[in-house]
Amino acid sequence: MNDNIIIKGAKEHNLKNIDLTIPRNKLVVVTGLSGSGKSSLAFDTLYAEGQRRYVESLSSYARQFLGMMEKPEVESIEGLSPAISIDQKTTSKNPRSTVGTVTEIYDYLRLLYARIGVPYCPNCGKKIEKQTIDQIVDNILELEEGTRLQVLAPVVRGRKGEFTKQLEDYQKAGFIRVRIDGQMYELGEDEITLDKKKKHNVDVVVDRLIIKEGIRARLTESVETAMKYANNLVTIDVPGQEEKIYSQNYACTDCGISFEELTPRMFSFNNPFGACPECTGIGYLMRIDEDLIIPDKDKTLYDGVKAFGASTMKKGDTMAKMYFESIAKHYGVKIKDVPIKKLPKDFLNKILYGTGDEVIDFEYTSAAGTRKYSTPFEGVIPTLERRHNETKSNGMRSFYEMYMSESPCLACHGARLRKESLSVKIGELNIKELTDMSIDKIKEYINNIELTPTHAMIAEQILQELNKRLQFLIDVGLDYLTLSRPAGSLSGGEAQRIRLATQIGAGLTGVLYILDEPSIGLHQRDNDKLIATLKKLRDLGNSVIVVEHDEDTMYAADQIIDIGPGAGVHGGNVMAQGTAEEIKNTPGSITGDYLSGRKQIVVPKKRRKSNGKSIEVVGATEHNLKNITVKFPLGQFICVTGVSGSGKSTLVNEILYKTIARDLNGSNEKPGKCKQVKGLHNIDKIVNIDQSPIGRTPRSNPATYTGVFDMIRDLFAGTNEAKMRGYDKGRFSFNVPGGRCEACSGDGVLKIEMHFLSDIYVPCEVCKGKRYNKETLEVKYKGKSISDVLDMTVEEALEFFDKIPRIKSKIQTLYDVGLGYIKLGQPSTTLSGGEAQRVKLATELSKKATGKTLYILDEPTTGLHIADVHRLVDILQRLVDTGNTIIVIEHNLDLIKTCDHIIDLGPEGGDKGGQVIAVGTPEHIVKNEDSYTGKFLKKYLN
């Protein structure tokens, strides 16, 4: 096979008809400015073609499930292998997905518990032994004399099928009745037709008898018969009582509880046989949250209880007011002008959760007269939960859900599994307790359990697989994660590194792996582990192409491909190719300029002092935070640093941001646990500039998000042509009927479903993709229609609106954040996370500064080349220069070295983290020997 991947004439997106030879079975880094064409080369050309060729080789039946990829714009690619992409998109948001299920480690743990787990009685905790038939019969005979019962053989449990042959066999064997899915049928009499696509439970009725003297022999024979047909199981059905399953396998002789044979599905929370029946295996239920109902305990009952009349109570008599006053009178509690926090706890509980059986005398006066009645009070929270369950209105359901939060299931306490499954242990721990440990602790535990020689032999292969997979996760710096952590709560970098570890576990060879910035969210300390993992993937015999900006990865790569020189139309060329040393010496390579030090981000000569005010988080205990108190000085550029999993996002996003958003903006999101957040009066607003999309549909774009499109529509509506035709600004909107093309409803494209090929979008034949109707497009400003303006890049628009300061200043900020290459009308769905974040930054920059705004950014350098980081630093410094405060969660040392104040958390990740290690200027942090950040920052300050 060819030793190289040879690309000829790549023209996808902004690529300039490039020819490129990439060595196979090597670690290759593709780098370049944001928007230069790296992803167009790696993902939209190489991955798309590798995937397309593989899918094309399958049958048309298989293709309809996979979706066909479009052929990229490239003349030819030789030497291409099947491609696997490991990108930044976070793993499933499905609440049933956990780190354990995504990595498949949980499947091995289920197998381990099914094979060598020891069951204990869920009631008395006694170790469960197997039962003999005599013990089972003795247990049944303890029922009162005269008790009627049925002896059933549970022959089918939760299996799909029609079972016609089996039912015929049971009839031939002399059985008269069967119970299917809870319903009785007579064999040979009733017509039995089962849906083969549904799961069924089938029990054969072996005997019906009454407990009396001399029945033992018959009962023993019936139990033996049932066990013969039902794999050592028998069910005893006593009318009006819970059915009992007895097994010759496992049962508690004291409590009469029997266990079925341990199987892996018993430990799966995604299977009805293992899942907690109350929460169906999710681990939590949505319930009305006391903290969301009473967000401010300094208010009185009259105006502090949300969703229960707080907004109307002040205006006069309401039912809610009458309830509160009648209950207060009954218990002799004064509530007028008394803050909720000073009310007796027991009284507040009665208001929130009801008075139980205690009857209250209520008196309600309205225009219709006075009405008296006596009844127990249901309670605010039960009332709202009942209304939520009963309402048929989606609007009301959404209203009640604003006051709900996830609360652990009361049956399983968040463990997701039924009590029988949680009663099986290996050593001292059940499967839930084991998965709640961090990955490195799990590895240590399973390697130190004492096993009998038989168990050791059974478990040998399973433990081998577990050790291998756990080690891969440790190797990519994820030792701090727990296997029970929901997959949806992982950051993009964590999710990507999990998939990377899973791929190494798969052990494939001859594959082309394409990764998108795997170093995101990873502290410099763990970079070596990640690089070793990438090399391991390469050494298995794979080609590894990484889109990356991290210096360490570049130096470790066999080859670097630098795409540039600029972004958008100014990019798309190969500027340099070779090792890091060769790139350094290539003129015209911006990457080479920064690697060699010819260009660099300068350390500020002096750091800003705080304005003397601060915000302080006191006693933070959410997730792994160890009751820490942290002060954020205002008027400074602050970086929160620390290794992955040390608690940075918990402190800044979960506690600080959500508390301020609740108190300043009235947000309903529940903040993380802390005693209090002080100093909120020192700021007037908080803005979280994250990487979530600026819109969910192709209709939203940078022009609409920044607000500049409104001004452009005003401009077009003010032209003479528009005035003559009587067009207002609404005419120039593609979202409402009037000026838009109705054939495509202003989308510019039509979706065509291709069934066994992927859906394709074709330009609308009526408007030719311009979104507007002919009449609207006839209105021109400086010779351009509204559609032409949307099609301009930011850079072109800047020149076009040069003489209109209002519009120019808005577009200028987009250019300043490095987005000169994107189009004003570019659909938001095509913007990367980093681009979306910079559109938000530009929008904030264009607003009037109050000097009292707190900005929060979580890893803003994601997807940014060092030259882009340089530009970002300048913008952030501009925002702070106007008196605002910026808090950034970051690992990028080039950005960290430019900030005024660092808060370093650690020392490790997970339960070994959550402490404040160092606080102060970068110069102060590097002197702290306990700080990993300080250790790596040192060389950046010199």
Q: Residue spans of the language-model regions?
A:
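Conserved phosphate-binding elements of NTP-dependent enzyme cores
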Residues: M1-N942
